[in-house]
């Protein structure tokens, strides 16, 4: 029995019985109180009902208490504060969750969630102008793990990478590759400021020289540009795909911005929005305060972004008449919706925080308020090596690439460490600490817990083979897991699916990492108690019954840690 789900269903049933309203009960929370004296679980249902019925929350809470006290898994119910209902669960109900994990694993990990959403999540979308730098890794890991979580709870998810292959940076890439091509033909070249001086483009010039000889030099400029652009973008995308694959990240779709231009999708989207009365000709208001020298007060085509909460309307054309980047964003969002997505998630870097309102406006307009949109910002990673910050710049050619860091510490460490802070908070990534074998290193601490659980089972198999066979056959008495430490660990194990569900609901993958660190900490504490007091050891040859129960506990811990690591794309370690 999943205690969290069971209590939620019983609260819904009580709401229907008492107030003939089960829909409102679906919005109630079932949480774990921060303080044990407030019980095991707590709900705000009384305050929700009270607001709806215009009655006292405590009066509502008392009625719920009267109905729910009779439930077989409830030990006691207390009313606290303005009307919180605090539940203490019987120990045997918590203990039974161990059996559910071990014997009904698939059912225990199943989450009953709305599966009608077809989610498109766009993340990374780095310009294809060079190897990915470590700054992109946070958004890449966040987006990938969020997608995995959403898939885990049952949503249909498309993982997408938007290829910015139609902007000025691509023109700079082409110019740089052409210089490297001429260099490969024997010319002495200098890479001007503003282009890409990194040596990673030298092989591209050599390939072009080998394939074309000097033909590109005499070719029509437009034809030459097209050939070099297609070649360079594809090579850089191959590089980015490999960098991502080495991090365990694979997108379903790489979508070309250029294709929106080539297929006339921008024109089609503008025509649609014009018909909706959302495109007009006008001038943008001057920036507040001192007039910015780049402010353009010309009459131009604008999208009524302010209709949907944006701070200003947005230009869809540049001064030269070409489509703006925003116009591409309009067409791209429409394309996603036309493909069947009814929930768009954008994962952006800290430098794009100003895009949140405009993206929300785009989706609200094109989705006609029927398509959900969430824009998640990943703050900067402060990458440190031996206490010295590493500057990251493709243009300067001295960035720390994903490949560099992956080679140094491995994908599992990168993936886990990128989740050790909430995505909208800056993250310090210390190369020294992530390689330490100590409790100060969270990935080591969690992996070590997994290894220890396996060693417990191996030790029992070796020292107590008959008892181990009984354990595998499910012959254990879980009521023996009665110490405070054991019950607290069991409560935490029982909350695993609740944590997973919350991670999906709030788009917060870091909750998984935090949960695993907490579980590992509690397990290691109990392990250390066993060093001081043999009664706390997991394998006690003189007490077969208690050993059987603790083998079940160790196995449940192992399964939940493995499940958590699998969700975030980290390989559980069997030995260290």
Curated annotation (Swiss-Prot):
Oligomeric and partner information: Monomer.
One GO CC term on file: cytoplasm
GO molecular function: arginine-tRNA ligase activity; ATP binding
Protein location: Cytoplasm
Enzyme class, spelled out: ligase
HAMAP family assigned to the protein according to its UniProt record, in alphabetical order: Arg_tRNA_synth
Main location: cytoplasm
Origin species: Rickettsia felis (strain ATCC VR-1525 / URRWXCal2) (Rickettsia azadi)
Stated name of the protein: Arginine--tRNA ligase
Keywords: Aminoacyl-tRNA synthetase, ATP-binding, Cytoplasm, Ligase, Nucleotide-binding, Protein biosynthesis
GO terms under biological process: arginyl-tRNA aminoacylation
InterPro entries named in the record: aa-tRNA-synth_I_CS, Arg-tRNA-ligase, Arg-tRNA-synth_N, Arg-tRNA-synth_N_sf, ArgRS_core, DALR_anticod-bd, Rossmann-like_a/b/a_fold, tRNAsynth_Ia_anticodon-bd
Motif position, 'HIGH' region: 126-136
Catalytic activity: tRNA(Arg) + L-arginine + ATP = L-arginyl-tRNA(Arg) + AMP + diphosphate
Pfam families: Arg_tRNA_synt_N, DALR_1, tRNA-synt_1d
EC number in record: 6.1.1.19
Family recorded in the similarity comment: Belongs to the class-I aminoacyl-tRNA synthetase family.
Lipid metabolism among keywords: no
């Amino acid at each position: 029995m999943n205690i969290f789900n069971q209590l939620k269903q019983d609260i819904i049933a009580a709401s229907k019985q008492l107030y003939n309203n089960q829909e409102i009960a679906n919005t109630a929370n079932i949480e774990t109180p921060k303080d044990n004296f407030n019980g095991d679980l707590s709900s705000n249902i009384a305050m929700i009902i009270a607001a709806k019925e215009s009655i006292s929350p405590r009066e509502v809470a008392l009625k719920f208490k009267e109905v729910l006290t009779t439930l077989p898994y409830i030990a006691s119910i207390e009313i606290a504060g303005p009307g919180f209902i605090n539940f203490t669960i019987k120990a045997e109900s918590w203990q039974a969750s161990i059996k559910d994990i071990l014997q009904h694993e698939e059912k225990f990990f199943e989450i009953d969630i709305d599966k009608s959403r077809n989610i498109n999540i766009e993340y990374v979308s780095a310009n294809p102008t060079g190897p990915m730098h470590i700054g992109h890794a946070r958004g890449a890991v966040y987006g990938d793990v969020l997608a995995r979580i959403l898939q885990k709870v049952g949503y249909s998810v498309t993982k997408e990478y938007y290829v910015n292959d139609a902007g000025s940076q691509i023109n700079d890439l082409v110019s740089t590759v052409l210089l490297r091509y001429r260099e490969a033909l024997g010319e002495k070249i200098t890479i001007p400021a503003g282009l890409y001086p990194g040596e990673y483009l030298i092989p591209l010039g050599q390939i072009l020289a080998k394939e074309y000889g000097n033909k590109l030099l005499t070719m029509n400029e437009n034809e030459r540009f097209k050939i070099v652009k297609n070649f360079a973008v594809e090579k850089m995308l191959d590089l980015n795909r490999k960098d991502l694959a080495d991090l365990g990240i694979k997108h379903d779709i790489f979508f070309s911005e250029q294709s929106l231009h080539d297929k006339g999708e921008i024109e089609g989207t503008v025509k649609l929005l014009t018909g909706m009365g959302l495109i007009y000709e006008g001038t943008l208001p001057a920036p507040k305060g001192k007039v910015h020298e780049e402010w353009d007060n010309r009459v131009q085509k604008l999208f009524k972004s302010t209709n949907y909460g944006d701070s200003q309307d947005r230009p869809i054309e540049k001064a030269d008449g070409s489509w703006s980047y925003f116009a591409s964003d309009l067409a791209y969002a429409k394309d996603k919706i036309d493909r069947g997505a009814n929930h768009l998630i954008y994962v952006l870097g800290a430098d794009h925080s100003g895009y949140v309102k405009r993206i929300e406006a785009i989706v609200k307009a094109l989705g006609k308020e029927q398509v959900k949109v969430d824009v998640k910002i990943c703050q900067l990673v402060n990458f440190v090596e031996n206490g010295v910050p590493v500057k990251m710049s493709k243009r300067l050619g001295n960035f720390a690439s994903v490949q560099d860091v992956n080679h140094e510490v491995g994908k599992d460490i990168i993936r886990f460490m990128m989740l050790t802070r909430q995505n909208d908070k800056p993250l310090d990534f210390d190369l020294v600490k992530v390689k330490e074998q100590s409790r100060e290193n969270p990935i080591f601490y969690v992996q070590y817990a997994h290894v220890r659980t396996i060693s417990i089972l191996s030790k029992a198999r070796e020292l107590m083979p008959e008892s181990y066979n009984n354990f595998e056959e499910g012959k254990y008495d879980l009521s023996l897991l009665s110490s405070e430490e054991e019950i607290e660990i069991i409560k935490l194990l029982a909350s695993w699916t609740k944590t997973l569900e919350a991670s999906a609901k709030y788009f917060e993958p870091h909750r998984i990492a935090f949960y695993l660190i907490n579980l590992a900490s509690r397990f290691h504490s109990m392990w250390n108690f066993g060093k001081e007091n043999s009664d706390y050891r997991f394998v006690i040859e003189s007490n077969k019954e208690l050993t059987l129960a603790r083998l079940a506990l160790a196995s449940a811990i192992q399964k939940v840690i493995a499940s958590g690591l699998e969700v975030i794309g980290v390989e559980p370690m069997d030995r260290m």
